[in-house]
UniProtKB/Swiss-Prot annotation:
Pfam families: Trm112p
Taxonomic lineage from the root: Bacteria, Pseudomonadati, Pseudomonadota, Gammaproteobacteria, Pseudomonadales
InterPro entries (alphabetical): Trm112-like
Gene3D superfamilies: 2.20.25.10
Cellular-component GO terms for this entry: cytosol
The family this protein is said to belong to: Belongs to the UPF0434 family.
Organism the protein comes from: Marinobacter nauticus (strain ATCC 700491 / DSM 11845 / VT8) (Marinobacter aquaeolei)
Name of the molecule in the record: UPF0434 protein Maqu_1739
HAMAP family: UPF0434
Length: 62
């Protein structure tokens, strides 16, 4: 994902910062403990499509 695009995106729930996961398949909001999928290169920024981070993922902030 383009760094400029990532810098413009915000969590749709809290408007906080998003981080790209190591596999580059999800955008992570650590504040809300949510992971938004990236499908075919397009971020799916819908809370209903997000998954909740596991406890280990919450502790493994980058």
């Amino acid at each position: 994902m383009d760094k400029k695009l990532l810098a413009m995106l915000a969590c749709p729930v809290c408007k906080g910062e998003l981080k790209l996961n190591d596999a580059r398949t999800e955008l992570i909001c650590y504040q809300d403990a949510m992971a938004f999928p990236i499908r075919e290169g397009i971020p799916v920024m819908l809370a209903v499509e997000a998954r909740t981070l596991s406890t280990d993922e919450r502790l493994d902030k980058h």
